[in-house]
Amino acid sequence: MDNRPIGFLDSGVGGLTVVRELMRQLPHESIVYVGDSARAPYGPRPADQIREFTWELVNFLLTKNVKMIVFACNTATAVAWEEVKNALSIPVLGVILPGSSAAIKSTTSGKVGVIGTPMTIQSDIYRQKIQLLAPQIEVLSLACPKFVPIVESNETKSSVAKKIVYETLEPLVGKVDTLVLGCTHYPLLRPIIQNVMGSEVTLIDSGAECIRDISVLLNYFQINASREEKKADNLFFTTAGTDTFKEIANAWLEESIDVEHTDL
């Protein structure tokens, strides 16, 4: 048994979509979450800068004595996950491989769409992972640079959000039967995305898919938290103002949380 928390990092609030799934499926595990909203979005930034920022988040989590780190950010996973995983002695998970595997299982037409930040799409990592496992699948990738700012400003239900999502996704409509939400911010736009793509298209939440991998690694390394002892409080940190983060988190997690500011 290991009652240390699991660390989550993201460029902002998007990783809360992963945390919500963990709280549902592994409620006895405690969490330390850090979101770099002050420097979001990561997607348009150069790879070296994303790598630098990611290491700052990792080092912050290490000061909190975490037993595992989850990259709840596709952009950070695409750029820095491999490097961090190889450098640390604790397990480090990314969200891209679980999302790719789920897309392969889902598609019946052999045509999968992937949406993500400019850096995630530019890295071509989803297409590579999917076609490594299933070379016959056609992958259509689309960068959606305006989606993260909508989520970070808590405008997901606005008419502007609907217009932007519709205009951005138009090139994929009718061309795929499965769409990977290749950014953990995007599930917060899920109702609009589903409406635009059509009810027949399966949406893959890459972040939620990684919870199964977290559970497997907890068992493998025998670092599950005790179900008998009272778990530590979940901790949430943001590099930006706490009010917007808290508003989004309370609505998404369906509970009131405390959020602290950090300058890393």
Swiss-Prot record:
It catalyses: L-glutamate = D-glutamate. The active site is at C73, C183. InterPro entries: Asp/Glu/hydantoin_racemase, Asp/Glu_race, Asp/Glu_racemase_AS_2, Glu_race. GO terms for biological process: cell wall organization; peptidoglycan biosynthetic process; regulation of cell shape. Keywords: Cell shape, Cell wall biogenesis/degradation, Isomerase, Peptidoglycan synthesis. NCBIfam families: glut_race, PRK00865.1-3. Provides the (R)-glutamate required for cell wall biosynthesis. This is Glutamate racemase. It comes from Streptococcus uberis (strain ATCC BAA-854 / 0140J). The gene is murI.
